[in-house]
Each structure stands twice: as structure tokens, then as C-alpha cells.
Swiss-Prot record:
NCBIfam families: GroEL, PRK00013.1, PRK12849.1, PRK12850.1, PRK12851.1. ATP binds at residues 29-32, 86-90, 413, 476-478, 492. It comes from Staphylococcus aureus (strain NCTC 8325 / PS 47). This is Chaperonin GroEL. Belongs to the chaperonin (HSP60) family. Gene3D superfamilies: GroEL, GroEL-like equatorial domain, TCP-1-like chaperonin intermediate domain. The gene is groEL. Keywords: ATP-binding, Chaperone, Cytoplasm, Isomerase, Nucleotide-binding. Together with its co-chaperonin GroES, plays an essential role in assisting protein folding. The GroEL-GroES system forms a nano-cage that allows encapsulation of the non-native substrate proteins and provides a physical environment optimized to promote and accelerate protein folding.
Length: 538
């Protein structure tokens, strides 16, 4: 592959063209009067969206230098989405503003390293000021407001608020496509795992084909149970207590399964057997989660425990268990609260440390099952195109709401960034460092300016009035009114605003300190000469 190089001003200007192309496509979506962007999909219907990171990921430019510039801004959107889950359009607008202003100064002779120091200094002060202005999210109504602003839909905000209220802030909220027109919320309380009863003869309700156990005992083991004699001493103790038992094992088979079913049908005792969830190491971890939730002890060779020696005090308990053909749901396990809290803290640490998206998702599911439950928002729409667009908006709104619960909220509509303008302007600096601070100062007004322009207004006029307004007072572009943003529920999560600013500044600083760009130039394939026709061939 042939490489081509560009240096200094040539390199930066070529990359800037790419930055502008991507940012201009993304920034039309910002604000309540932002527009949509249509993305061509090769094998499906076009996707209509206003989600910044989704648009950014689709952009691939022909010129390799311009494409590198676009990829840098794409990285801003990706990183912001990864950390905060929303605010990708704001981050893109901030990055473009810093890069454009910074490049003017570099072209005029400013030292990029000095500019970088100034940018870093200004962003640090701005982030501190954002946290000072931040307010905690304290009630269901405020959670609904955050979701509604992000999705531009009050109904979506309400669904997310209800879901978080029912499953807790650490609970899993999943978004699925519905077959109908309406969007619905479905909540599964307690721990649910995707394993059902091993025999339909174990059901307690033959109409619903469900086994419902009240105040059951739990036998949790990673062993295969083939012989009924292995568990008979334990079952005799359970029968004396006149309570049902749920057996969670690697497999219940042969003589053991037959006798459990026969005794169930005779009415001797009620026992339901289910396979242990997960596979390999994940199975062991999930069995430990279940044991901690119910107060059971895992019967495993790792601890030198055998089924024949198991006693009733090694079993867990819960207020209720429901077992269907496919799922088992445990409600209100009787495990020790301190042990559950310790397990939750351990899972949170593992989530922070893991670098695998798949592992993170599985750990979050386990955390939710221990901490609260699972809520499913089933998205409905009239067409597939609308369904995809609506699903993306709900995903952003959910991420935004989680971020708000974590770090609080600030005034929305770009107001929070202008509110820290004064603090940043008070930074004492000289020369190129001062210029770097000024680059950030100008960028802080860019989101408000763009929101106003998308609403068909003059951005500069709105920005100047906002600089002189009381903190928290901002411009509501949806109604063209000046209001107290927090009181009106026009809010942004502090984490989203902070992440957008930090990632935009990071990429802008790297861009400005770039002096050479190396691009791969695809080699042109020379057309092969046509082969002569063979005798007898057409």
C-alpha cells in the first residue's frame, strides 16, 4: 500500500474539511427544532434519525485526509456515548467550534502546545463550575423530565421514570421492538433467569402451565443429580417442614427426576427442578448470586460439600418463586442484606474494570437481578422506519436519565455551558495559554448558538442575552421564550454535559498539535487484458 504525506497547514486544512462535513451533518439535529438525517442502508429501508453518534458512524469520506478529520470527530461522539450514553451532538458541535477557532490561531502563528495548555486549563475550571451548579435528581418527576427532554417526548420520559422507580437505579431496563403500534412497559420484579421446569408434571397451575411456590426452600448446586438417594435425606427434612422446594442443579435426571415427579403427582411433597443458568465460569457466578439472594449455600466440590451431607440449614428461602416452561423468577429472597450489598459492590467494581462490552452487559444483568429487577420497554410504531428512529431516541433518553441520577442535572439547552462562561473568563493566563482559554470560551456558546439557528433565530443575539441573564435562566427554543430552565424541566445530565466538553477538548487539542498526516492511497487496479476466445467457446 502506497503512503502519502501532508504537512502542517496543508494537513490541518484537509482534515478540517472532513471535520466540517461530519459536524455539519450532525449539528442540524440539535435542539427541540432540530431536523432529522436520513441514512442509506444497503439491505433495509433508510434509517431516519437525529442521534448524533448513529449519524457520525455512517460517514465515510472519499478523500483519506478529510476522512481522518471526520474520524477524529467520530471518536468524540463515540467516547461521549460510551461514557454518558447521550450528548453526542453537543460534543460534536463543541469539537468543531474548538478546532475551527484553534486552527485560526495556529495559522496566525500561535504555538499549538500553548493552546493545548490553555484548553486543558479552561476545561478543568468549566467542569468544576458545572459540578458546583449541578443539582441532584430527587424524585420521579425530575427523572421523567430528563428522559422527556432527551427523547423530545413526554410519554417516553414517563415510561423511563416508571421503569426506574420499579426496578431501582441499578435495575436492568431493556428496549425491545413490539409487534403493535403502542409503546408499553413490562416489569419483572426479582431475579429472573432463562431456565424453566425440567418436567411439565411439576406445574401447580395446569391452566397457565406454571409452577408457583410460596415460601419455598432452595437447593443450589453445580452437580448433576442422577440418584434420588443422594437427595432423599434432605427431602425428608423438607417434607417435615411442609414447604415446597426448588432444586437448581446442573441437571436433574434419571431416577432422581422420576421420583420427584411421582411424589409431586401423589401429593407427597412439591418439588420443582430447573437447570442452572449460564455456562462455565458464568454459571458458577450466577449460582453464587442466587445463593446470596436466597441465603443458601452452594453445594459444590470446590467447598468439599456433598449432596448426601446437605442439611436444611444449607437451603435458601424466598417469599415466592414462579417457574414457567422457559423462565424462573425469584421474588424477595431471604438472603442477608449485608451479603447482598457486598455482592452488588463487587459487581459494580467488575463492571468498571472490564474492557469487554459483552462481559459488561452480562455483569450489569447480574447486578440488576440482585439489586431490583428487569423492566422492558416495548417500542411500537406504524412503520419499521419509525420504529428504529423511536427506539434510538428511547435508548438515548434512558442513558441520559441514568447519567442524571449518577451526577445530577444542570440547566438544559446549552445554558449550563454559558453559565460557566464567567468562571472560565476569570482564569489568569498570558500569551498562547490565554488564547487557548479563549478558544474554549467561544466554544462554550456554540451549542446555544446552533440550537437557536436550528430554530430559525439569530444565534449571536441569544448568546449575548444569555451571558447577561441570571444563572439557570435560558432560552426555550421550543416556545421562543426566556424561562428558568430548571423550573420548566428543561435540564441536561451533568455527566452528559461534562463528558461532551472533556472529549471535545481532548480531540481538539490533539488536532491542533498535529504537524504531519500519513494516509494510505489505494492502488488502482490495472484492467487485465481480455483472454482470447478458446475454440468452440462463445
Amino acid at each position: 500500500m502506497v503512503k502519502q504525506l501532508k504537512f502542517s497547514e496543508d494537513a490541518r486544512q484537509a482534515m478540517l474539511r472532513g471535520v466540517d462535513q461530519l459536524a455539519n451533518a450532525v449539528k442540524v439535529t440539535i435542539g427541540p427544532k432540530g431536523r432529522n438525517v436520513v441514512l442509506d442502508k444497503e439491505f433495509t429501508a433508510p434509517l431516519i434519525t437525529n442521534d448524533g453518534v448513529t449519524i457520525a458512524k455512517e460517514i465515510e469520506l472519499e478523500d483519506p485526509y478529510e476522512n481522518m478529520g471526520a474520524k477524529l470527530v467520530q471518536e468524540v461522539a463515540n467516547k461521549t456515548n460510551e461514557i454518558a450514553g447521550d450528548g453526542t451532538t453537543t460534543a460534536t458541535v463543541l469539537a468543531q467550534a474548538m478546532i475551527q477557532e484553534g486552527l485560526k490561531n495556529v495559522t496566525s502563528g500561535a504555538n499549538p502546545v500553548g493552546l493545548r495548555q490553555g484548553i486543558d486549563k479552561a476545561v478543568k475550571v468549566a467542569v468544576e463550575a458545572l459540578h458546583e451548579n449541578s443539582q441532584k435528581v430527587e424524585n420521579k418527576n425530575e427523572i421523567a423530565q430528563v428522559g422527556a427532554i432527551s427523547a423530545a417526548d413526554e410519554e417516553i420520559g414517563r415510561y423511563i421514570s416508571e421503569a426506574m422507580e420499579k426496578v431501582g437505579n441499578d435495575g436492568v431496563i431493556t428496549i425491545e421492538e413490539s409487534n403493535g403500534l403502542n409503546t408499553e412497559l413490562e416489569v419483572v420484579e426479582g431475579m429472573q433467569f432463562d431456565r424453566g421446569y425440567q418436567s411439565p408434571y411439576m406445574v401447580t397451575d395446569s391452566d397457565k402451565m406454571v409452577a408457583e411456590l410460596e415460601r419455598p426452600y432452595f437447593l443450589v448446586t453445580d452437580k448433576k443429580i442422577s440418584s434420588f438417594q443422594d437427595i432423599l435425606p434432605l427431602l425428608e427434612q423438607v417434607v417435615q417442614s411442609n414447604r415446597p422446594i426448588l432444586i437448581v442443579a446442573d441437571e436433574v435426571e434419571g431416577d432422581a427426576l422420576t421420583n420427584i415427579v411421582l411424589n409431586r403427582m401423589r401429593g407427597t411433597f412439591t418439588a420443582v427442578a430447573v437447570k442452572a443458568p449460564g455456562f462455565g465460569d458464568r454459571r458458577k457466578a450466577m449460582l453464587e448470586d442466587l445463593a446470596i439472594l436466597t441465603g443458601a449455600q452452594v453445594i459444590t466440590d470446590d467447598l468439599g460439600l456433598d449432596l448426601k451431607d446437605a442439611s436444611i440449614d444449607m437451603l435458601g428461602t424466598a417469599s415466592k418463586v414462579e417457574v414457567t416452561k422457559d423462565n424462573t423468577t425469584v421474588v424477595d429472597g431471604d438472603g442477608d442484606e449485608n451479603s447482598i450489598d457486598a455482592r452488588v459492590s463487587q459487581l459494580k467494581s467488575q463492571i468498571e474494570e472490564t474492557e469487554s462490552d459483552f462481559d459488561r452487559e452480562k455483569l450489569q444483568e447480574r447486578l440488576a437481578k440482585l439489586a431490583g429487577g428487569v423492566a422492558v420497554i416495548k417500542v411500537g410504531a406504524a412503520s419499521e422506519t419509525e420504529l428504529k428512529e423511536r427506539k434510538l431516541r428511547i435508548e438515548d433518553a434512558l442513558n441520559s436519565t441514568r447519567a442524571a441520577v449518577e451526577e445530577g442535572i444542570v440547566a438544559g439547552g446549552g445554558t449550563a455551558l454559558v453559565n460557566v462562561y464567567q468562571k472560565v473568563s476569570e482564569i489568569e493566563a498570558e500569551g498562547d495559554i490565554e488564547t487557548g482559554v479563549n478558544i474554549v470560551l467561544k466554544a462554550l456558546t456554540a451549542p446555544v448558538r446552533q440550537i437557536a439557528e436550528n430554530a430559525g433565530l439569530e444565534g449571536s443575539v441569544i448568546v449575548e442575552r444569555l451571558k447577561n441573564a441570571e444563572p439557570g435562566v435560558g432560552f426555550n427554543a421550543a416556545t421562543n421564550e426566556w424561562v428558568n430552565m430548571l423550573e420548566e424541566g428543561i435540564v441536561d445530565p451533568t455527566k452528559v454535559t461534562r463528558s461532551a466538553l472533556q472529549h471535545a477538548a481532548s480531540v481538539a487539542a490533539m488536532f491542533l498539535t498535529t504537524e504531519a498526516v500519513v494516509a494510505s492511497i489505494p492502488e488502482k487496479n490495472n484492467d487485465q487484458p481480455n483472454m482470447g476466445g478458446m475454440p468452440g467457446m462463445m
